[in-house]
């Protein structure tokens, strides 16, 4: 029948039999008929030995040791080895004890035989570690692990007192060394005492010097702090003065701007009045020009030339208006420049604006001259076409329209004003004598007309006669 077995915390169940190829390790399992189950205790066991060994000088000694040995629980392969090789025997049986003791004694003797007694005695810790490593290497074959190895002090074999003599030697060396150490300590104490006294005096002098230096440093730092504070106060005062000056400057700039705005507004108002007056004056002049044009139309020009004259007059009016606007802009720019001169940092800007305004006025004046020239060219061209390409008639019209004859008459009148000219004719008493002299005056007119024609290019009216022929 089936039996359910459970192992304790430090145990494993070792199961063999049917359905199991080799062995099976488990903490709990059903044990079937035809299967065998044994308990494998994993707790380590202490083994105490006194190993007798011999050094390289053939000196025997005893090595007391206590080894704590048990199965390696962290390796399944080691557990299987232990279950197969060791578990069939009792844990404290002579078989296991002899196995472990034989491994330890064999490795210890081999290692001791390669070392002198002095090396074993002075390198006890290293000797113990090498014994531990070599024994562990052999125990791995059986799945065993050394949990702890406590190798005691080496002991002499009876009849051989090497370690006791070595201990006495060590004691004497230690005693002598102690005496030397006491003498050296006494010497060092006296030297140290004198050294401490000298160092005390040196340190006192050094501290006094450092105290004076620190006091001077503190005084200097205090003076520097005072200077720093005074400097900061002065800097703060300068900053406040600069801010006040800046505020005053800003106020002056604002006042200048306000004054400028007021002056500009006043100038603009005056200029607007002047512009309006100019517009009205222009309108009056335009009406006068239109009236004059109407008169000229009735006397000299055809309907087409009258329309052209009207357009020319309108163009002249537009030109006049633009000139007035240019003058107004120029005046405004000059006013702005004069207002900006109130600010110290605007001199260059005002000069620049005045130059630009003057340039603009010159450009406008040039444009006006060009426009007038173009208009006059168109006017003369139209007038020439209207008069049938008669240059003489055009010239006469322009001279009449330009008032040249009136000006000549005016100049001549001014020249003879107050002379009160009189024509006196003296005759010899003949009846035809007076008329003959009058006829002589009329004979002088053709040469006069010829002179006028040569100077002005104008011909006298037909009713006044014709010019004398050049060949006559």
Curated annotation (Swiss-Prot):
Pfam families: Band_7
Topological category with respect to the lipid bilayer: Lipid-anchor
Main location: membrane
UniProt keyword list: Cell membrane, Coiled coil, Lipoprotein, Membrane, Nodulation, Palmitate
Subcellular location as annotated: Cell membrane; Membrane, Caveola
Tissues where the protein occurs: Very low occasional expression in roots and nodules.
Record-linked InterPro entries: Band_7, Band_7/SPFH_dom_sf, Flotillin_fam
Function recorded in the entry: May act as a scaffolding protein within caveolar membranes, functionally participating in formation of caveolae or caveolae-like vesicles. May be involved in nodule formation.
Similarity comment: Belongs to the band 7/mec-2 family. Flotillin subfamily.
Name by which UniProt lists this protein: Flotillin-like protein 6
Protein's organism: Medicago truncatula (Barrel medic)
Lineage of the organism: Eukaryota, Viridiplantae, Streptophyta, Embryophyta, Tracheophyta
